[in-house]
Amino acid sequence: MASLFKDPTKLSAYRDRRFTGTQEEYEAALQASVTVYVGNMSFYTTEEQAYELFSRAGEIRKIIMGLDKNSKTPCGFCFILYYSREDAEDAVKYISGTMLDDRPIRVDFDWGFEEGRQWGRGRSGGQVRDEYRTDYDPGRGGYGKMVQKELEAQRELVDYGGAFQPNAPPQYDRGDRKRGYGDSYRNDRDYQRKRYRNDERSSQRAPDSEFKRDAIDSEKNPRFREKGDSDEEDDDYDKRRRR
């Protein structure tokens, strides 16, 4: 059961990679520091809320909110600077694990704030832990940044017709027949193709049909005259009709 609790000999559960000294120097800085690091905060927790909670441990000198380096908005952590070491110890002892803005927060000793540490270190601007997080956390922006990018890419692919959209609203024609978005386009395209083929066939058959029509007219018209016919034959035909 001892593994369920913090090691009392360790002042902090993490080691800041920006600290340039040795491990011994790092631990010495933690023992003398009046700064605590607060993690697992909601993106929507304000500085006033943090002040109200941490002032119960002692008088606060300064609060530095952690910010997304791109959007300059809170990204889930902060630094609390006290005036005394005793107050910092009380904050770690009594406030770590309590609820702030409906979230259990983590409080650790910090070796001391320096300019630049207020910015998130993740590739997307926020904290590294929020880059590849696959669980949905509404207090920290939903899914992790990389997961959100994948979801946005899938939505864009669907919007541009690159993938099937299962929830697309159906369309109805006059016969109340369901069809997808692409059916009207395909029907129009097929119609144009059929019309083009019919026109092409009609143009190819036009000379033959005209020739047949002329031949029929020539059979019905007794006065249709072939080559070599003379006006005398027409006169004989008129005389026979008058008789």
Curated annotation (Swiss-Prot):
Pfam family, one: RRM_1
Segments forming domain RRM: 34-112
Stored CDD domains: RRM_NCBP2
Keyword hit for Cytoplasm: yes
Family matches, as InterPro entries: NCBP2, NCBP2_RRM, Nucleotide-bd_a/b_plait_sf, RBD_domain_sf, RRM_dom
Keywords of the record: Cytoplasm, mRNA processing, mRNA splicing, Nucleus, RNA-binding, RNA-mediated gene silencing
UniProt: mRNA binding residues: 14, 37, 106-110, 117-121, 127-128
Primary subcellular site in the record, as a coarse category: nucleus
One GO CC term on file: cytoplasm
Basic and acidic residues bias locations: 128-138, 173-228
Chain intervals for the UniProt region annotation (Disordered): 120-144, 161-243
PROSITE patterns xref list: RRM (PS50102)
Species annotation: Oryza sativa subsp. japonica
Subunit organization: Component of the nuclear cap-binding complex (CBC), a heterodimer composed of ABH1/CBP80 and CBP20 that interacts with m7GpppG-capped RNA.
Protein name: Nuclear cap-binding protein subunit 2
Keyword Cytoplasm recorded: yes
GO biological process, one term: mRNA cis splicing, via spliceosome
GO terms, molecular function: RNA cap binding
Similarity comment: family membership: Belongs to the RRM NCBP2 family.
